[in-house]
Amino acid sequence: MAFNFNWSPLMADAGFYTRAQELLTAALNKSPKPPIIVGDITVTELNLGSIPPELEILEIGDLADDRFRGIFKMSYSGDAYLTLKTCVQANSLNTYMVTRPKFTSPCPLAADHGLTIPLQITLSDIKLSGFVVLVFSKQKGITLVFRNDPLESLKVSSTFDSIPFVRDYLQRTIEGQLRLLFMDELPAIIHRLSLRLWVPELRGQDTEVKADEEAGPGQDPLLSPPQDPVDASGNVLSVAQIASLSLDSGVEMHSLFSQRNLVRLATLTDSQRTLSLFTPTIHDVVFRALTGAMEQSESHGGLISPASPPLSRTHSHVASLHSLQESSMSKSSLGSPLSGCGLTMGAGRHPRTRPSRKHKRRVVDLRKPQKLDDTSSTCTDSEYTVSTDASTVFSSSARVGEKPDDPITPPVSPDATIKVKDRSRVPAMQGLGPSVTNKAGQSTPSAEAEKITLSNGEPSYIPHQNTPTIEAHEKGDDNTISLNGVPPSMLSFVAVSQDRSILEQAWMMKLANEISRRIQEGKGPGSVGSNYCGRRDPSPPPAYGQ
């Protein structure tokens, strides 16, 4: 069985070539393009040539007036050609960087910048050979499917034919793209073309598309002026002004809005954020459609707690400040700022605060009970004696004038004076408080140092500001020394014993008389003795401005 192909009508129909170029352009840009092609591929020329393909019938499955199905062997070696235009990337390093992941590719500074060059490619000398399944129907068009890869060879001519490696690269790349085109895209292109030729409904759609293209784009509704146009300042424009604007340029017509619309937009702007055009105007009133969480946080200063209201946190903060002020005035209220801070920080979690505990001070008296009687005296011109109760010195119930187990006996030295270094000892003893007591009979390093000073007989002096007065007073058989306000540095060597010798008692009397005489000499306004004896309740200073 032989077939005669009438190939000349395809050469004469210009509309067929136009539709074929559009379909080929869409097909070439649809498939994934190689990275070297950076622009769209456009089919500029398409010519099927004058030599038709050769068909050999292998099988006919269905044959009727309106349908046909058969398997053919097709071979084509004609003069058809195809011309494409696109843009390619001339810098191969740029292509390499695009196709590689960033963490494995180098980071050149300027060597990978792109260089785009226009490219024109012409495909000619196309040779095809393969098995084709052809199905024809007037209602469904023509379906052409290749059972194998039909492309044998083709010639690629481009702008870079003078560069061998570019020419070879384009040859390989285009051959691969054409193989995909013949296997996937060409059957769909042929089917769409056949539908436009034989199906009348699709012919009507093509006619409507052509009519729309001839009509041109629609008119912009904004170019037609409104009924009451105004300018940007709100001034009403006349017909002559509108005509002059339209003659100058059509762009400024977009800025002409209706005065009524401008009034409604201004009302919407002043509508108290309620999106209502008719919100009543009330002074000192802010309208809100909904109170959000952000506005609640702004009204309460940003203190939001799901467990407690913001007002409780505010009051607790004030309480903590008040407690901090009280703590600077009294040491006993030391726990109040801590409790106030805890109330402030954890008001939502711990509604109750723990009361501050008072520190218990336990005093253990390990000394032996004394048999001395407390005596008292007052300040006189020659001498003064006070009770031996040491509570004025140590602020406790511990006794000072007691019998030591190992009494300290200084040597007899009538010319020696006592050098007292109580500047470093008094703060230490005052800081320890009543919780620290020395055992009876123990000698401290300071006492031994003072004993060595007395035994050497070195002359010393007693400063008026830091040296208290000591006086020995004999009553009956026992010799006692009355102390009042004596610093702890003097207590280390003023221990009284009943077994002292007469010489030692005489030395103590002379020492007491010397101290009393110096006190009497230094007595006066601003002196140490007068301040020590009479400064019990000092009068407050006069007020400012008097």
UniProtKB/Swiss-Prot annotation:
Entry keywords, A to Z: Lipid transport, Lipid-binding, Membrane, Mitochondrion, Mitochondrion outer membrane, Transmembrane, Transmembrane beta strand, Transport
The SMP-LTD domain, residue ranges: 1-195
GO cellular component: ERMES complex
InterPro entries found in the cross-reference section: Mdm34 (IPR027536), SMP_LBD (IPR031468)
Biased composition (Basic residues): 349-362
Main location, first listed in the record: mitochondrion
Recorded topology in the membrane: Multi-pass membrane protein
Basic and acidic residues bias spans: 363-374
Alphabetical GO biological process terms: mitochondrial genome maintenance; mitochondrion-endoplasmic reticulum membrane tethering; phospholipid transport
Location of region: Disordered: 208-230, 299-319, 344-382, 395-416, 517-546
GO MF term list: lipid binding
UniProt-annotated location(s): Mitochondrion outer membrane
Record-stated family: Belongs to the MDM34 family.
Domain notes: Lacks alpha-helical transmembrane segments, suggesting that it resides in the membrane via beta-sheet conformations similar to those predicted for other outer membrane proteins and porin. The SMP-LTD domain is a barrel-like domain that can bind various types of glycerophospholipids in its interior and mediate their transfer between two adjacent bilayers.
Function of the molecule: Component of the ERMES/MDM complex, which serves as a molecular tether to connect the endoplasmic reticulum (ER) and mitochondria. Components of this complex are involved in the control of mitochondrial shape and protein biogenesis, and function in nonvesicular lipid trafficking between the ER and mitochondria. MDM34 is required for the interaction of the ER-resident membrane protein MMM1 and the outer mitochondrial membrane-resident beta-barrel protein MDM10.
Known partners and oligomeric status: Component of the ER-mitochondria encounter structure (ERMES) or MDM complex, composed of MMM1, MDM10, MDM12 and MDM34.
Name this protein carries in UniProt: Mitochondrial distribution and morphology protein 34
Organism of origin: Arthroderma otae (strain ATCC MYA-4605 / CBS 113480)
